[in-house]
């Protein structure tokens, strides 16, 4: 490939960055190896970048009359507004960054692209895989034509990413 590499947004933990709630990463060497020479990765961790720190308590998605909320599992504290403030700013940045695609971390309350487990208020019962991570949902709303996958789509999705 000559010239500039295409820009691909990616959940930072998939590149081995230790930004997850437990202080670890979820490195996906296959993604890196397949794409490293063809793309410029733009790593993003909504929870860390929104100031929630590392490590941080686990969170989950809850259904509420106000929509899907991101809740700290141990305390019930609602982190949705903090994340949404960051997401609003980040989506504007993504518009200027000209990314061609995004690779999300599956099942994450912020980055889950496919249905993420959704709970009733107070995590009393699972409503099943019905939700979508807040950041992933915002990206889909704002960039409906963009190719978006999660790490479970590899290696098949790599062919689409490097057309």
Residue spans of the language-model regions?
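Short amphipathic alpha-helices and their capping/turn segments at secondary-structure boundaries
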Residues: 1-3, 30-40, 86-100
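N-terminal phosphate-binding or glycine-rich loops at protein starts, especially the Walker A/P-loop
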Residues: 2-39
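Short beta-strand segments
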Residues: 11-12, 45, 103-107
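Short catalytic/ligand-binding loop motif for oxyanion handling, primarily in non-cytosolic enzymes
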Residues: 18, 53, 110-114, 157-159
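Glycine- and acidic-residue-enriched helix-capping/strand-helix junction motifs
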Residues: 20-26, 120-130
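Short, surface-exposed acidic-centric catalytic microdomains
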Residues: 32, 39-67
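Divalent-metal-activated hydrolytic enzyme cores
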Residues: 66-89, 93, 97, 124-163
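N-terminal glycine-rich phosphate/adenylate-binding segment common to multiple enzyme folds
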Residues: 86-121
């Amino acid at each position: 490939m000559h010239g500039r590499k295409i820009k691909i947004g990616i959940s930072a933990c998939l590149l081995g960055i230790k930004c997850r709630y437990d202080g670890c990463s979820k490195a996906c060497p296959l993604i890196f190896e397949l794409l490293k020479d063809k793309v410029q990765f733009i790593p993003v961790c909504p929870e860390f970048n929104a100031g929630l720190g590392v490590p941080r308590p686990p969170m989950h998605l809850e259904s509420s009359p106000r929509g899907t909320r991101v809740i700290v599992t141990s305390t019930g504290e609602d982190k949705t507004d903090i994340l949404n403030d960051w997401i609003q700013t980040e989506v504007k940045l993504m518009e200027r960054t000209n990314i061609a695609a995004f690779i999300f971390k599956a099942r994450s309350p912020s980055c889950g692209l496919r249905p993420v487990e959704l709970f009733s208020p107070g995590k009393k019962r699972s409503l099943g895989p019905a939700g979508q991570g807040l950041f992933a949902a915002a990206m889909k709303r704002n960039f409906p034509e963009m190719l978006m996958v999660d790490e479970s789509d590899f290696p098949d999705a790599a062919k689409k990413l490097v057309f």
